[in-house]
Amino acid sequence: EDLISDPLNEEGDMPVPELVHRYPDRVLLMINNQCPIVCRFCTRKRKIGFPGIVTRETLRQGIEYIRNHTEIRDVIMSGGDPLLVPDKELDRILAELRSIPHLEIIRIGTRVPGTLPARITENLCSILKKYHPLYFNMHFNHPRELTLEVEKGCAMLADIGIPLGSQTVLLKGVNDDSATMKEL
């Protein structure tokens, strides 16, 4: 049953709540449990919707863990979706992470640019721009997701220097043919 609700066994690699430390030099920090969409391939369905933002105390424990483990050079902010956290709180979390000298890379795993493109605002971009280098790992699974609004939001992120990558999930009947993948 545990592998059904937690198929990647993330809970087994959590030295502190909401922080997965599976690989020596990187961690996954879950900062909230809200998503703009529930993906059929989600490996964290057990968490989605339970209280939204992770508590400040839990985040403090995660950030302190990163600070105290100098082998960690890369953090992936995830959740839920980090971009559903209010701007002020996201700014605070990024400032804390960026203050850690040995942390070289901050990645944000998000579906917001493709599912809630109106969230990509000038204010959000001004916050993100302060914390370079930042990298976005997004999910786009079909070319129809790339609407004009989505393209505008992605362009705003690219214009402030954020590299944008897509973690495309191969889905039967959706994108499992070469023509669709080529177009995507």
Model-predicted segments: where are they?
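Conserved AdoMet/S-adenosylmethionine-binding subsite of the radical SAM
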Residues: 60-74, 83-184
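Domain-level signature for proteins that mediate thiol-based redox and metal-cofactor handling
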Residues: 18, 52-53, 67
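Canonical Radical SAM [4Fe-4S] cluster-binding loop centered on the CxxxCxxC motif
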Residues: 22-54, 108
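N-terminal [4Fe-4S]-dependent radical SAM core
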Residues: 1-28, 46
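N-terminal start-of-chain detector that recognizes signal peptides
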Residues: 2-4, 49, 107-111
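Generic, ordered loop/turn and secondary-structure boundary motif
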Residues: 9, 20-24, 36, 49, ...
